[in-house]
Amino acid sequence: MFKNHPKGLIGAALSNIGERLGFYVMMAILVLFLEAKFGFGGTTKGVLIYTVFFTSIYVLALVGGIIADRTRKYKGTIGIGLVLMMIGYVIIAWPTPTPAPNKTLSLVFTCFGLFAIAFGNGLFKGNLQAVVGQLYDNPTYSGRRDVGFQIFYMFINVGAMFSPILAVGVRNWYVQSQGFGFNQTLPDLCNQYLSGTMTPEAMERFTGLAAEVSRGPVADLGAFAQKYLSVFVTGYHYAFIVAAVAMLISIFIFMANRKRLPDPAKKVVNKDAVAAAGAEMTLAEIKQRIYALFAVFGVVIFFWFSFHQNGVTLTYFAKDYTNLEGFVINLGFMKLEGAEMFQAFNPMLVVLLTPIVIGFFGWLKAKGKEPSTPKKIVIGMGIATAAFIVMALGSQGLPTKEALTQMGGLEQARLVTPWLLIGTYFILTVAELFISPLGLSFVSKVAPPKYQGLMQGAWLSATAIGNSLLILGAVFYNNIPIWATWMVFAVACALSMGTMLAMLKWLERVSK
């Protein structure tokens, strides 16, 4: 796979595996952790924190890009970012009491850890992508840039593939070790009971579920609610320890492979290298390239707003409306089950489908019919539109979230098949492979050399703006029919596709 690619590619890819594993352990459970620990269920507070955090990761990537571009110390910036992230994971892994005696202080402590992770990620993510792009500035490898970024992207998802399984496994193991059964809806019901907001219908369901997970009648529901919440949330805290360990491994891999990665700081003073790279771009050419990049950045905002619903509304849908009864892996000492498990499908499918997509584009290239990078992105937008239309069709007839809360949850017979989400994740993953790695390649190819880190940061900032809109997904989910929520995302992706299609010839000309 790495044949005919620069040696540094494998080091960069392996460095990213541990970091992504830790990151996606956290992202798989973050919203549900916030809801369970702080009682945010049925509100947008948890999603607001998730949105601000997810947005700041990509905004701070712009800051990280500026720092690396000015200092020319890309590898040093990346290393500091890795250490900061590990510190952040240690902070949120600390098992503070639940229910919290001082909820505000506990929330501030959690948010401080999230900020450390976000800032560290900002120093790491865009700059590592810039370094990978620099590997392909060598004319020997420049023709394989798209494939190189697809391989790099696949390795990102090798780490992410196991993250939800590890997160769910650690949490469920701890719940079982404390003598309880697992139930995804109980944390919300426990918080409703403790806050005195439970409806009579929900109370009946809560009493039944409490007896089910306790393996017998529960005499004191208040004591049960406090104990179950404490155990469930502590399981989440222990899952964050996995993220911290993964970061430690990533630091070790990066340091071991550091010498294989390019060092732009040295190239600045190497006049022969500068001469070999060709004459400086004219100001007009630089402007044209930057205009093209920002046009693409503006378009992909709406794709990321839709695609990153996997951690918000798609996870809510798995918890609230999906039949998880047969979606269980019993390992004896623990059961792998829960809404978070669906998030394993996207990275797993990326790993499985990337060689197929690379082979498909290679076959088209051999025939002289390979579409340009901008055209591939347009196709990806169309595929993403189809994914959300599938979700809308599969959600017909489901009650609103408000009605669901009053009922205390859906009866088993009314829950939808898990294949609806699995199929949607499959289609979205195909769309992602046409957009995300090729978008990175496009930025690397078009960005003026002196602004590589900045432009990679700007690409991630476009993602940040899309992420800042994630809370709208939760607002739609809580207030309009479920099928209509998915159609909002379908329309957003369709508009992105149409806009990109209108600019296609210009983008193809600039990227040549």
PLM region descriptions:
Residues 3-54, 295, 304-317:
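Helix-loop boundary and gating motifs at the non-cytosolic
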Residues 43-44, 139-152, 336, 449-458:
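Loop-to-transmembrane helix entry/capping segments in MFS-fold secondary transporters
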Residues 48-70, 161-163, 344-357:
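Central cavity-lining transmembrane alpha-helices of secondary-active solute carriers
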Residues 28, 62-63, 158-173, 393, ...:
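A gly/Pro-rich, aromatic-decorated transmembrane alpha-helix motif that marks the paired
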Residues 1-9, 137-146, 168-334, 357, ...:
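Intracellular loop-helix junctions on the cytosolic face of multi-pass helical membrane proteins
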Residues 80-104, 381-410:
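C-terminal ends and interior cores of transmembrane alpha-helices
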Residues 17, 88, 101-127, 400-434:
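Hydrophobic core of transmembrane alpha-helices in multi-pass small-molecule transporters
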Residues 70-85, 143, 363-382:
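Cytoplasmic membrane-interface "Motif A"-like loop-to-helix N-cap segments
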